[in-house]
UniProtKB/Swiss-Prot annotation:
PROSITE patterns: PCI (PS50250). Keywords: Cytoplasm, Initiation factor, Protein biosynthesis. The keyword Protein biosynthesis applies. This is Eukaryotic translation initiation factor 3 subunit K. Gene3D superfamilies: ARM repeat, domain 1, Winged helix-like DNA-binding domain superfamily/Winged helix DNA-binding domain. Component of the eukaryotic translation initiation factor 3 (eIF-3) complex, which is involved in protein synthesis of a specialized repertoire of mRNAs and, together with other initiation factors, stimulates binding of mRNA and methionyl-tRNAi to the 40S ribosome. The eIF-3 complex specifically targets and initiates translation of a subset of mRNAs involved in cell proliferation. InterPro entries: ARM-type_fold, CSN8_PSD8_EIF3K, eIF3k, PCI_dom, Transl_init_fac_sub12_N_euk, WH-like_DNA-bd_sf, WH_DNA-bd_sf. Belongs to the eIF-3 subunit K family.
Length: 218
């Protein structure tokens, strides 16, 4: 798909989502093609994907398991945001039992628990599932690096490589450099966490801008 075609589709979808047409099942075909475009081109439109899941709620006979799996996998790539949880809330009970969807839900559970080694092992056991999502592995690695960056002062180099999906030395050096960490031989120096400690009030909140696409569907 050319850049012009992709931009045209993006504008068409944006127009649909701003009107009552978002509830028209006749628009499912273009919305589903838009999901597939996101998977191929490593783009992400959470609002459009929620609209697809909502249309499946209203029109269960039009449910497409493959498209739903792509939407859920794209939501995984946006951890630690709550996209996956909100997408899961729109799934009909009858489709939650789908084997592939159950596998993706399990991936989300262990990713949320920050069990990155187990996550990597499970993904390696189902390469065909995630290979269709362009940029999937790098997006997950960004989340891993985010957690490592706020958790460790130093980490064993082999352990870090394992957490990042069993990557080789060259790829590991890329991620170490990307996050400004330091290679100290067998250890990777992350940060002096004592310098990052600040007294603050902690509140659990979800930003309104993040909920807006979901509210528009209700």
């Amino acid at each position: 798909m050319t850049d012009t075609m992709a931009e045209t589709m993006k504008q068409t979808v944006a127009s649909i989502l701003k009107s009552i047409e978002r509830y028209n099942p006749a628009n499912l075909e273009i919305l589903e093609r838009y999901v597939e475009m996101q998977s191929r081109e490593n783009t992400y439109d959470w609002g459009a994907n929620l609209a697809v899941l909502k249309l499946y709620q209203f029109n269960p006979e039009k449910f497409n398991a493959d498209i739903t799996c792509q939407i859920l996998l794209k939501a995984l790539t946006n951890f630690p945001h709550t996209d996956f949880t909100l997408c899961k809330c729109l799934l009909l009970e009858s489709v939650v039992e789908n084997e592939t969807i159950s596998q993706i839900k399990y991936l989300a559970d262990i990713l949320e628990q920050c069990d990155f080694a187990q996550f990597g092992n499970r993904v390696h056991q189902m390469p065909e599932l995630c290979s269709r999502i362009s940029g999937f592995h790098d997006s997950i690695r960004k989340f891993v690096c985010h957690v490592v960056g706020i958790t460790f002062q130093t980490i064993d180099k082999n352990n870090l490589a394992n957490l990042l999906g069993g990557i080789d030395d060259v790829t590991l050096k890329h991620w170490v450099k990307k996050y400004g960490w330091r290679d100290d031989g067998s250890l990777i120096f992350i940060a002096n966490q004592d310098e990052n400690i600040k007294t603050k009030n902690i509140t659990e909140k979800i930003e309104f801008d993040h909920l807006a696409p979901l509210m528009a569907l209700l």
